[in-house]
């Protein structure tokens, strides 16, 4: 019967937190090419106010930016060939979709905080 190697055996890997920061930087650079910087700043501020400077906040920001960029590219970004049908312009406004997603996240956060405050009173 074979034994499993210990977790610290094997090739060295990059520390998780460094990898998360690198991925976030790459996504941020790409998002700045496609979305309004003021909108991205508002999203970053919301995540920071909610999670502080934590890996959990960085992970949430990564998930939101990945989804926003995927939808943007899928809809036919002028800088990308992903999802683009030649001769057809996308009629969707992806900045408006991203704004709605951010607004939904903020409303959901406020509702969670409000329910916690009301439950705490009792």
From Swiss-Prot:
Q: Which UniProt keywords apply?
A: Activator, AIDS, Cell cycle, Host nucleus, Host-virus interaction, Phosphoprotein, Transcription, Transcription regulation, Viral penetration into host nucleus, Virion, Virus entry into host cell
Entry keyword annotation includes Kinase = no
Its cellular-component GO annotations read: host cell; host cell nucleus; virion component
Q: Where is it mainly found?
A: virion
Where it sits in the cell: the answer is: Virion; Host nucleus
The answer to whether UniProt assigns keyword Protein transport to this entry is no
Q: Which InterPro entries does the annotation name? A: RetroV_VpR/X
One family from Pfam that matches here is VPR
A Gene Ontology BP annotation from the UniProt entry: viral penetration into host nucleus
Give the source's domain of life in one word. Answer: Viruses
PTM annotation (Phosphoserine): residues: 80
What is its biological role? Answer: Stimulates gene expression driven by the HIV-2 LTR. Prevents infected cells from undergoing mitosis and proliferating, by inducing arrest or delay in the G2 phase of the cell cycle. Cell cycle arrest creates a favorable environment for maximizing viral expression and production.
Fill in the misc note. This is a macaque isolate.
The subunit field of the Swiss-Prot or TrEMBL record says: Interacts with human UNG.
Q: What is this protein called?
A: Protein Vpr
Q: Which organism is it from?
A: Simian immunodeficiency virus (isolate K78) (SIV-mac)
């Amino acid at each position: 019967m074979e034994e499993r190697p210990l977790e610290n055996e094997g090739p060295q890997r990059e520390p998780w937190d460094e990898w998360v920061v690198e991925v976030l930087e790459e996504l941020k650079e790409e998002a700045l090419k496609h979305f309004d910087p003021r909108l991205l700043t508002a999203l970053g501020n919301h995540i920071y106010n909610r999670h502080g400077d934590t890996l959990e906040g960085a992970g949430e920001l990564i998930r939101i930016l990945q989804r926003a960029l995927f939808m943007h590219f899928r809809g036919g970004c002028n800088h990308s060939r992903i999802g683009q049908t030649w001769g057809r312009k996308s009629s969707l406004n992806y900045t408006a979709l991203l704004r709605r997603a951010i607004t939904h996240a903020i409303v959901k956060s406020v509702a969670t905080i409000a329910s916690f405050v009301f439950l705490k009173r009792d």
